[in-house]
Amino acid sequence: MTAALDMLAAGRPAMIWRRQVADTETPVAAALKLIEPGRGDFLLESVEGGAIRGRHSIIGLAPDLVFRAHGQHAAINRRWPHDRDAFEPCPQPTLSALRALVAACRAEVDPELPRALTCLVGYFGYETVGLVEDLAQPSADPLGLPDMMFVRPTVLLVFDRLADTLYLIAPAWPDLARDPSAIVAEAEARLDAVAARLAATHLPAPVRADTPEPSYTPALAPGRYGEMVAAAKEYIAAGDIFQVVLAQRFSAPFTLPPFELYRSLRRINPSPFLYHLDLPGFALIGSSPEILVRVRDGEITVRPIAGTRPRGKTAAEDEANRTSLLADPKERAEHLMLLDLGRNDAGRAASPGSVRVTDSYTVELYSHVMHIVSNVTARLADDRDALDAMFAGFPAGTVSGAPKVRACQIIAELEPERRGAYAGGVGYFSPDGSLDSCIVLRTAVVKDGTIHVQAGAGIVADSIPEYEQRECEAKAGAILAAAREAVSRAGESAFGQ
């Protein structure tokens, strides 16, 4: 306590924390007790190899600050708990404003706390590429989301699955106009309130609803995607690009609480990056397989993924599919192209000569598919930071194409509406300035009683439009399956009532 008071008196943030045994508590149960819709709360989880849950899960609650941006116009609401309309424009351009906020949220962390700490959590939408590249964008924006949004939680819960331990953490931010002891007392009170709610023996009653099974309505008219594929192939034939990823949106009614969709998705399609962001006005719910950029201890990491086969029903079928995948020249060529992109992207923010491919052409298993994966690392240059590393490789080649800038130009020309969160990044900044992010894939935007899912296919010279259309539908199908499972579960509860 004395150390925290001294830090606050010196104008430095402090982390007020406690830990408790959590062998009977789960992240989902805690989220059901604690998350309030639309407040900016979140749950982050991970599943490796489609079967092994990650060591740490993170819940963030009751933000005191919300940052959002549209293009170069950023705004911060520092009175979020009291007035959700109190956004004030930032005087700097968007990335400068975000960089200043990340710096202001830097804090010393007790070495006894896990590394999986967050101070700012949110997303970068695809259109934020316009902050670093001069690209025209479609004017149609049916979802109307901010280009980026980040929240700063006042309470964090970090579950350590290996140690059966729960860390309760309340950041205490300095205010030289206030007594540090009052700031610490408020942080302790927040922890007391959360601990009391966690101790409640009963979960909220199951959601009960008798609603029709959802089905998708495509945003594109029949045949329109095929026309987009044909136009892209003309650009490929002309030598403009080697590949471009063209996406489309599917929508379906969904009137259940967004967290019910997340509960189903994490079971049906577990992935390394699972997230439920219950943001003001909408929710982002996803199960992404692919890292976007990680910056930790001065090291940049990117992991290009390209090349896919379904999982087999047996170990022998898995091995046969793995062998087939690695022997496929088209899959290997596509992966090599994206691996080269990853090396180039990392190199733009790296110390000269530090880029390394530490794993190449490794097959990783996920819940329903297997992918070819490579790993690229580099030392962050002394004059660069995590945001530089993020936008050196933004957007990822796996959701844009190659060469990247020309592919993005063609995407803006051929896709009829803005992508929004899709193909951007979900992630968090840690108190030490680290960044962990994933590509927004297999993700739903839940807004106004509707789920919106975008999915794309990589278009190359020999692409067949009908096949690429089916690939988009199949990728979007994981979210639809989760929505149907959630509706079915709610219907069973209603029937049982």
Residue ranges and their predicted role:
Residues 1-497:
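Extended alpha-helical targeting/anchoring segments
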